[in-house]
């Protein structure tokens, strides 16, 4: 299935699940959507936190398309699930933004680690959340983001359990793709990130960690949602964690070496 066909299936309601493992050679994107009045500070926030918030594209006020992401793409309908935040609280999850769209909304598309999973799989590195049919586990850490204006919050990380040799190989592979979070930020003891229980992720689903495996943590594009909550904007919208926007950008084009 091409990215365009995948987006069409989401648009007509045929697909509503997590997007990991779909359209493997193509990049997926996290979303943050907020009023134009706050967009400059949010852009500065992304630039100050590039590991967690690598920008793939920024829209014009009111625009629900970003040409660099896909020719027939519609931000309002092409994500399986959206989170709506009001005054810093998650108030609802919706499957379309048609009823909520405003002429002053600015879209930020941020790289997603699902993008490099295809390369890991091609190297024979198993991905437990895909194997178990679950959403990837994501955790809010105790690490503060670099603040920009009203935006702060804490770093969020995704976790994939890997054997030692696979973890080393994963570092080598993902280092080539800083536009989708790049190399892991931590391998091993989750308490060093302020994570007390790997079986209780704040976002996504817990996965099995087998004997001899290490938890490997990548900076995650859910991080902006902690910033949106921290800022307590009257309204802000994001993808539901794990339910991403499929783009026409090839993963190969994002490699820096």
UniProtKB/Swiss-Prot annotation:
HAMAP family: Hydro_lyase. Keywords: Lyase. This is Putative hydro-lyase Bcenmc03_3969. Belongs to the D-glutamate cyclase family. The keyword Glycosyltransferase does not apply. One of its GO terms (molecular function) is lyase activity. Gene3D superfamilies: PSTPO5379-like (3.40.1640.10), PSTPO5379-like domain (3.30.2040.10). It is an enzyme of class 4 (lyase). InterPro entries: D-Glu_cyclase, Putative_hydro-lyase, UPF0317. Its EC number is 4.2.1.-. It holds the Pfam family D-Glu_cyclase. The lineage of its organism: Bacteria, Pseudomonadati, Pseudomonadota, Betaproteobacteria, Burkholderiales. The keyword Lyase applies. It comes from Burkholderia orbicola (strain MC0-3). Transmembrane segments: none annotated. Signal peptide: none annotated.
